[in-house]
């Protein structure tokens, strides 16, 4: 469950290391975002000479949460850290590599690129 002010790791090579959620997209009073939801983020920590600079604002898709996601068979997939992948205005990933596992819930038409770049799909 990601809400405003939540900090997330960045799971792509866009150059950002940590981001902070500044808005959960998808409704005027929407409070929480889960895996596969799009949020608006601000870059809080970045590596030098990278595409994403500190203070930049991007869209991002949540790929891992501590809260996890419940499957129809009753199992729950949880992670140690919250993580997101930065997106451009066309909702395509900015980076060319994805770090760490992603869940099968991202296998929608919109995020197939992220699933194909990920080293592991759970």
From Swiss-Prot:
GO terms for cellular component: cytosolic large ribosomal subunit. InterPro entries: Ribosomal_uL14, Ribosomal_uL14_bac-type, Ribosomal_uL14_CS, Ribosomal_uL14_sf. GO terms for biological process: translation. PANTHER family: 50S/60S RIBOSOMAL PROTEIN L14/L23, LARGE RIBOSOMAL SUBUNIT PROTEIN UL14M. This is Large ribosomal subunit protein uL14. Part of the 50S ribosomal subunit. Forms a cluster with proteins L3 and L19. In the 70S ribosome, L14 and L19 interact and together make contacts with the 16S rRNA in bridges B5 and B8. GO terms for molecular function: large ribosomal subunit rRNA binding; structural constituent of ribosome. Keywords: Ribonucleoprotein, Ribosomal protein, RNA-binding, rRNA-binding. Pfam families: Ribosomal_L14. Binds to 23S rRNA. Forms part of two intersubunit bridges in the 70S ribosome. It comes from Shewanella amazonensis (strain ATCC BAA-1098 / SB2B). Belongs to the universal ribosomal protein uL14 family. Disulfide bonds: none annotated. The keyword ATP-binding does not apply.
């Amino acid at each position: 469950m990601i809400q405003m002010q939540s900090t997330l790791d960045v799971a792509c090579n866009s150059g950002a290391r940590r981001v902070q959620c500044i808005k959960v997209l998808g409704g005027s009073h929407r409070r929480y975002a889960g895996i596969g939801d799009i949020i608006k983020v601000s870059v809080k920590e970045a590596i030098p000479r990278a595409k994403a600079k500190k203070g930049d604002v991007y869209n991002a898709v949540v790929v891992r949460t501590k809260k996890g996601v419940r499957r129809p068979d009753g199992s729950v997939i949880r992670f140690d850290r919250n993580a997101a992948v930065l997106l451009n205005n066309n909702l395509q990933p900015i980076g060319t590599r994805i770090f760490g596992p992603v869940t099968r819930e991202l296998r929608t038409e919109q995020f197939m690129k992220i699933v194909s770049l990920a080293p592991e799909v759970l």
